Amino acid sequence: MSVLRSMDKLPDLNRATVLLVSTEDALLQQLAESMLKDDCASELRVHLANSLPLPSNVNRPRIDLIVFVINLHSKYSLQKVEEFLQHVDSSFFLGKVCFLVTGAGQESHCSVHQNTVIKLAHTYRSPLLLCDLQVESFRAAMARRLVRILQICAGHVPGVSALNLMSLLRSPENPPSKEL
């Protein structure tokens, strides 16, 4: 088991691989199924993980995008994602990581405040996507969006890079810091 690196494998021709990471197995499975239903020009591979680091496997494909799914109804979900982030190489945060937050629609049941997750995404300079994955139509729309992001991150969309896309997905209330 080791740190997950973005460039440790060569890219595959017409193949895009996403890694969905969360403690919520049922939500991950439903999201993965919705993504696989989407029409994609390249071969789409979806890997699910409920923990990091991943086992060192020679046959594991190159991962083009990592999506950390955080359930606002579970502090455990946020704590585990924070732990998992330690096992991801910093090169992934150059446009190949995003956070997907679910459960924001029912604020009265949230045990994690939205601002906590916003700060986490801002700290890692990664986009934050909000979606209630319990609702089929929302899940399908998010799956289409993630497939499109994945195609860009895999380099299958001419003229757009992952880093360029992620800078466009940044929220306007969190402008880039002046320290850079």
UniProtKB/Swiss-Prot annotation:
Looking at the UniProt record for this protein, which Gene Ontology cellular component terms does it annotate, in alphabetical order? cytoplasm; inner kinetochore; nucleus
Report the Pfam families cross-referenced here: CENP-M
* A GO BP entry: chromosome segregation
* Cross-referenced InterPro entries: Centromere_Cenp-M, P-loop_NTPase
Please give the positions of the paired cysteines in each disulfide bond: none
Q: Where in the cell is it found?
A: Nucleus; Cytoplasm; Chromosome, Centromere, Kinetochore
- The signal peptide stretch is none
Keywords attached to this entry: Centromere, Chromosome, Cytoplasm, Kinetochore, Nucleus
> What does the annotation say about its assembly with partners?
Component of the CENPA-NAC complex, at least composed of CENPA, CENPC, CENPH, CENPM, CENPN, CENPT and CENPU. The CENPA-NAC complex interacts with the CENPA-CAD complex, composed of CENPI, CENPK, CENPL, CENPO, CENPP, CENPQ, CENPR and CENPS.
**Function recorded in the entry:** Component of the CENPA-NAC (nucleosome-associated) complex, a complex that plays a central role in assembly of kinetochore proteins, mitotic progression and chromosome segregation. The CENPA-NAC complex recruits the CENPA-CAD (nucleosome distal) complex and may be involved in incorporation of newly synthesized CENPA into centromeres.
What protein name does the entry list? Answer: Centromere protein M
The record lists the organism as Mus musculus
Name the gene: Cenpm
